[in-house]
Curated annotation (Swiss-Prot):
Basic and acidic residues compositional bias, start-end: 1-10
Gene3D superfamilies: von Willebrand factor, type A domain
Full protein name: Uncharacterized protein Rv0959
Region Disordered: start-end pairs: 1-41
Species of origin: Mycobacterium tuberculosis (strain ATCC 25618 / H37Rv)
Domain of life per record: Bacteria
Gene Ontology cellular component terms for the protein in this record: plasma membrane
Length: 672
């Protein structure tokens, strides 16, 4: 329920009401719009989908566009909304046709002629026989028949009424094409009503004449609206807004005409001259159309549609259908988001609500809010090159998600360390305990003072006195530091065999684990293809697969050695994820480091250089684990031999278990 007073449905109606009747509030039914009680947009699912697409090789901008197109588990995407828009358009064309006015005129004409024949059959004079001959000679064309009957002297009052209805219907249909709702509004209209319509058209054309010459003023417009505002429910605020609304409707009327067959156009053109019994209305509308086409040449005045259904539309209904179709086509383009600079804010929510209902507009508004929220809450930002990128906050969230999935696979193993002792050099655990003789941990000041205050609460003292019994210390734990090198294969085979995304999620999970639970550890991610290079988690996430020859594990091991030597006091760990034999190495790493030798099958020199790299890891005391992906027998033989040589381990996980295998191995080392 929402209150009827004020714009805010949850706010008291006015300060005066609140002061005079402090506890009195008035409520009325909720009238639509955004749900004021709806929960905020959930970004977790959205960010996870964007991260998946970025890791698969899409840019953040492209990933966001794909998310908006697909939607989420709980939110309809733009593609589905566009499909509904296109379905509605096809339905309008398939179910309806534009013969309604001609069919209705023919029906009224037949009824008028039949009633007149019945009246003539009862008459015995010669004039009645002559009148029957006139009716027999009427042409088959309804337009020509109506024209010939213009001077006919009707004997039947019922027949005369039917014939007058034809002229009245034509006038109302022509006006309904330009002013929505006129057909119903003028049903049973009097001559005075028709005179007011004619006067409105004359005044409107005069106003547009002045506007075309640049002589109109806001006062002219205000006077016109004061006099004729009832004909314009859109309530335009100036001449430009008036032109916008009139031109859209007039362009739809022109497309209605373009969609007719030549025979239908000829019939309606001839009939239009009889609207309201004279050609004056048609002349006024032609003058109005000329003004609108000159003022708004960008409207679609030449388009047409092919209707193929059985439901007949009149001129006004057909014009509205064509206006709806144009609006639907515009919505389809907006929802496609396929043009430069596209944004969900471009979608006309009012038009979407008119065509598909309020829920569709709510869904589109939520998509736009989702797009803004990802930027405003810091998950997307722009780099120095102006390109969108995932922010550090987004990377932390993606790492958290990846680690959560890995933790579920590890079945509750938490990786606690066994080396835990109190000491000033340790890291705070968040716990406190009473001080004991020999403790070197820092005092926890807040707990110490609280104990002293509570102990002396019953006594009155000018100052707080602290005793040994009050002192509590902050508990710490000593953490053994590790230097971890994660070597991930980024050769093109990883992309081709669908190992790209699991590899990236594995790296993200390990990175997040180290950054949040083992902050003293030094993790270095090294990506190796034809060359090897150190990368951040964000760089690896956005790394695109590139077709290039070479799996240069030798270069990666050399970079890992540098990392381990920089952290000589830490326990060294080397984790290698690869799906192929080493096929490249650096010939002159100590020189310029740019000369790559490639050969397939692997050249003995490449094997020798790579083995020496593993030997170097062993000399540094590194715990080496190799995660072999795929079933390449050559890789299996090489990895098994190397692992025995350096006393390392070989793990052969499936793709779904890669993250759990790598993180689990790291935790196994940390528990030792």
């Amino acid at each position: 329920m929402a209150k009827s007073d004020g714009d805010d449905p949850l706010r008291p109606a006015s300060p005066r009401l609140r002061s005079s009747r402090r506890h009195s509030l008035r409520y009325s039914a909720y009238t639509g719009g955004p749900d004021p009680l709806a929960p905020p947009v959930d970004l977790r699912d959205a960010l996870e989908q964007i991260g998946q697409d970025v890791m698969a090789g899409a840019s953040p901008r492209r990933a966001l566009s794909e998310l908006l197109r697909r939607g989420t588990r709980n939110l309809t995407g733009a593609d589905r909304l566009a499909a509904e828009v296109n379905r509605r358009r096809r339905e309008l064309l398939r179910r309806n046709n534009l013969d309604g006015t001609l069919q209705e005129i023919k029906k009224l004409l037949d009824e008028a002629v039949l009633a007149e024949r019945k009246e003539l059959a009862r008459a015995l004079d010669d004039d009645a026989r002559f009148a029957e001959l006139q009716l027999d000679a009427l042409p088959a064309s309804p337009a020509k028949a109506v024209q010939e009957l213009a001077e006919y002297r009707w004997r039947s009052g019922q027949a005369r009424e039917k014939y007058e209805q034809i002229k009245d219907l034509l006038g109302r249909e022509l006006l309904d094409q330009r002013f929505a709702g006129m057909k119903q509004a003028l049903a049973g209209a009097t001559d005075d009503d028709r005179r007011r319509v004619t006067e409105m058209l004359d005044d409107l054309n005069d106003l547009l004449d002045k506007h075309a010459r640049g002589e109109d003023t806001q006062r002219d417009f205000d006077e016109f609206m004061t006099k004729h505002g009832e004909f314009f429910p859109e309530n335009p605020r100036n001449v430009e807004e008036l032109l916008d609304s009139l031109a859209k409707r007039a362009a739809a009327a022109q497309r209605f005409r373009n969609s007719l067959s030549q025979e239908q156009r000829d019939e309606l053109d001839a009939l239009a001259q009889q609207a309201f019994g004279s050609p004056a209305l048609m002349r006024a509308l032609d003058r109005l159309d000329a003004h609108l086409q000159a003022a708004r040449p960008g409207e679609d005045w030449t388009g047409s549609q092919q209707f193929s259904g059985d439901n007949p539309f009149g001129m006004g209904e057909g014009t509205q259908a064509l206006a709806d179709i144009a609006e639907l086509e515009q919505l389809a383009e907006q929802l496609s988001q396929s043009y430069p600079g596209a944004s969900m804010d471009d979608v006309d929510l009012d038009a979407l609500a008119r065509q598909l209902g309020d829920q569709a507009a709510v869904d589109a508004r939520t998509l736009a809010e989702l797009e803004r929220a990802l930027v405003n809450q810091g998950f997307l930002d722009r780099g120095s090159d102006g390109q969108w990128r995932l922010s550090p906050k987004a990377m932390r969230r993606l790492g958290e998600t990846a680690l959560r999935d890995v933790a579920q696979q590890l079945s509750g193993r938490h990786g606690e360390r066994d080396h835990r002792r109190a000491g000033a050099a340790g890291e705070l655990t968040g716990a406190t305990r009473p001080w004991q003789f020999g403790d070197t941990e820092p005092w926890h000041v807040a707990r110490t003072l609280t104990n002293a205050v509570l102990r002396q609460a019953a006594a009155v003292h000018d100052r707080i006195r602290i005793t040994v019994e009050d002192v509590e210390v902050a508990e710490t734990e000593t953490r053994t530091q590790a230097a971890v090198a994660l070597l991930v294969d980024t050769s093109f085979s990883m992309v081709m065999e669908n190992r790209w995304l699991p590899m990236k999620r594995t790296a993200l999970a390990l990175h997040h684990l180290v950054c949040t639970r083992f902050r003293s550890d030094a993790l270095q991610i090294i990506a190796f293809g034809r060359y090897a290079r150190t990368v951040t988690a964000a760089e690896l996430t956005g790394l695109a697969g590139v077709y290039e020859q070479g799996t240069n594990l030798h270069h990666a091991l050399a970079l890992a050695g540098r990392h381990l030597r920089r952290h000589a006091g830490a326990q060294p760990v080397v984790l290698v994820v690869t799906d192929g034999e080493p096929t490249a190495h650096l010939e002159d790493f100590d020189g310029d480091g740019t000369s790559v030798f490639f050969d397939y099958p692997p050249h003995p020199r490449t094997i020798a250089h790579t083995v020496r790299g593993f030997d170097d890891m062993a000399r540094l005391g590194a715990q080496v684990t190799i995660f072999r992906l795929g079933s390449d027998p050559g890789l299996a033989r090489f990895i098994d031999q190397v692992a025995r040589r350096v006393q390392g381990r070989v793990v052969v996980p499936d793709l779904d278990g890669l993250g759990a295998a790598v993180v689990g191995d790291y935790l196994r080392f940390r528990r030792r």
